[in-house]
Amino acid sequence: AGGQDLTSVATITQSQVSTADFTTRASGVVSGLHVVAAVLEYCGVNHYEVLVDEGAKVSAGKVLITAQGNTQKILLAERTALNFLSHLSGISTLTNQWVSEISGTKCQIRDTRKTTPGLRMLEKFAVRMGGGVNHRLSLSQAALIKDNHIMAAGSISDAFNAIKKMYPDKSIEIEVDSIDQLKEAITLKPDLILLDNMSTDQCSEAVSITNGLVKLEASGGIAITNAKAYAATGVDYLAIGSLTHSAPALDIGLDFRKGK
């Protein structure tokens, strides 16, 4: 934004220098440190030290980054840097909670395209730092045939064959919401089938029917409280939209050192 930081300009001399620490107020999994570094540099703070790795599990009170430089410039960077760091670390922390919940199964936690506009790549990075895996990064990376595509194309087979003809080398995933649709989808030999809003019993049946011929992803109606039950059905992935659209920010603050 244009203009000045009125508060800092009025209360702090241009020559004042300080040392400040980005410190966690709660335990979690950290991500977005490289974004903080970019924000600091953009604001003219070039002396800083990153003290932990991306994806590190930290406790409350951990210093993540120490910055030293012009006090006005540090304060200019503060909120933007913290917004990125808290948001992305919140995603990593929530993802790690889901990953821990289904430990001991072969299932993996995946994100979705339900990301904040403009922040998709950063949010998907945060998911990886939390131990999750990414779904497609863009509409052009792979095809996902959903209910609206099926409705528009006429059938699952029509939609699949049209994509296969135009993009023979692209991965194709088919969304199904019934066992009957699943049986039709299997005959097409897609790379992945998404089981939409199916119960754990239906997911178990789907695993039995496919018998390893195609990877399965469950989505919809899954909470962290029943994640282990879904993972235990034998599906390969749980697709969790809340990782990116509902993750609470990790509490992180910026503290100036006294006398410095």
Describe these PLM feature segments.
Residues A1-L188, L192, D201-I209, E217, ...:
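Acidic/glycine-rich phosphate/pyrophosphate-binding loops and surrounding catalytic core
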Residues N197, G220, S242-L243:
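Short secondary-structure boundary segments
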Residues G212-K215, K258-G259:
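Short acidic, glycine/proline-enriched helix-loop-strand junctions
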Residues I224:
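Cys/His-rich Zn2+-binding cysteine-cluster or related metal-binding knuckle/ribbon modules and their
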Residues S242-K260:
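Short, charged, intrinsically disordered terminal tails
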